[in-house]
Amino acid sequence: HAEYFQPQNMILGIWGDFRSAEMKELVQREFGALPKGTAPRPAIPAIDEEAAAVSGVFLIEKTDVEQSFIRMGHSRGKQSDPDYYALVIMDDILGGGFSSRLFCNVRSDRGLAYSVGSSWAAGMDVPGIFLASGSTQLATTVQFINAVKEEIERICREEVTLEELDRSKKTYLNGFVFSFDSTGKIISRLMAYDYYGYPADTLEHFQEKIAQGKVPFGVRTVH
């Protein structure tokens, strides 16, 4: 803790009703004397792509349940990747809500799931995780897995429809504003962008890039 939690590795965010000049003076008075160290930010080991590409099936057997809970996915993608915005929309089309392909085709049409969806949590400095998940009856476990895999393969193989693309963009952008409905949330995200070396206007142009995203380009790099 003492080695890495030092002023040169910190970013301080302050929001509220105050005068900037007075706040700067207060911060300097309270924190200016902290001794600077020499320890850089700790390096994060790179992911072993070869090992990550090896697939596997892992089972946890329980005899006291009546449902199967399935998680399938892999490590992929950072927020700095050029196709990040396209993949955000792709994930929403695949499994982001009640109008998604997984929900409509696997749950509503085929009745194979109690719940089903997908998520893609892209990392800022390391690849994130793409995850498709859900729950089903024990007897339909294999059918559920195959149905989800079919939808993942289909969205990687075929272009999405304009209707899906437009609906997903609107849904995502309408919900986006609630992620930043307070000054604290905005400041926290700006600090994270700054800490990881993203452009200062990343958040400012986020919605614009989502609106311009073209899923067919991004889809082919996710699988």
Predicted regions and their residues:
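Non-catalytic, conformational "gating/processing" segments within enzyme and secreted inhibitor domains
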Residues: 1-30
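Non-catalytic beta-strand/loop surface segments
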Residues: 1-9, 33-81, 92-143, 163-174, ...
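A common structural junction motif
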Residues: 29-38, 150-160
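Zinc-dependent metallopeptidase catalytic helix centered on the HExxH motif
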Residues: 84-85
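C-terminal, helix-dominated tail/subdomain
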Residues: 190-202, 210
